[in-house]
Amino acid sequence: MKVLGIETSCDETGVAIYDSEQGLIANQLYTQIALHADYGGVVPELASRDHIRKTAPLIRAALKEADLTAEDIDGIAYTAGPGLVGALLVGATIARSLAFAWNVPAVSVHHMEGHLLAPMLESPQNRPHFPFVALLVSGGHTQLVRVDGVGKYELLGESIDDAAGEAFDKTAKLLGLDYPGGAALSRLAEKGSAGRFTFPKPMTDRPGLDFSFSGLKTAAANTIRQTIKQKGDLTEQTKADIAHAFQTAVVETLAIKCKRALQQTGYNTLVIAGGVSANKQLRHRLAQLMHALGGKVFYPSPQFCTDNGAMIAYVGHLRLQAGESSGLEVDVKPRWVMTELPALA
């Protein structure tokens, strides 16, 4: 089965083709970073318009990359949520229209399930086996999920305010870094020195697996403001030191909660996915954690950490092969709880 996957939930337009026998055979991605850079964040209306312009050309490019025609496609998968409603509608409308025109089934895919299963796109020796604990960490979500199979999910904990990626982006903006801020802050943190600044590790002093990053962001803002008041300005080294301290606090918080989740479930496999899973310090810290616990950690390669069509095509092929399909109506869910998804046998 060859499945065309379409991802348009935010500011990346992704189109890919997954073959149940050959694996990923085409992967096309267009990012809107330059479009939104002047605004310091994603502008939903501009994102939707750009998806309209880019999706069809990327579909043609994916077919060409795989040396296929429309007649070779057996099904279409598209992101139906969560995400920006206008952006989601672009991908869903195109997917439903093509499915009708090509007379193939289409299936809606949960964006975060795509991220969760993205490590399955790796080579067999680098894929996790069920069951495992997943840390989904991105600009919009920070969640710990117990995973017992495809669709067999239990939410163990999540952020009660800002997601980790959102806190990265907002703190980067306070430091005057370019958009996208999270990646810029991580690069700057590599130049920082440990010990000059320290930030709290929120909600680690109490039981539970929920997260809170708004207070950490406020602590960073106060530190920046006080330093400017005392010194008159922020040197590049001071910015790097603040970035290092902030990133360390986030990473340590995530590591502490992951350890608790693994102990609570009794599992010894950890998966990290989502845009922030590309963070080098986070990967290193969680690798240390799993080595100490005698377990294994898995994550997608960097190209599959950010939003992409490959993860949508992969999940779509699983659900289409299981007999799932969506109706002709174009239905998107800007807010969609992953635990509502049907489990596959």
Curated annotation (Swiss-Prot):
Enzyme class, broadest EC rank: transferase
PROSITE patterns: GLYCOPROTEASE (PS01016)
Subcellular location: Cytoplasm
UniProt keyword annotation of Acyltransferase present: yes
Cofactor binding description: Binds 1 Fe(2+) ion per subunit.
Coarse class of the protein's main subcellular location: cytoplasm
EC numbers, comma separated: 2.3.1.234
Name of the protein: tRNA N6-adenosine threonylcarbamoyltransferase
Name of the gene this protein is made from: tsaD
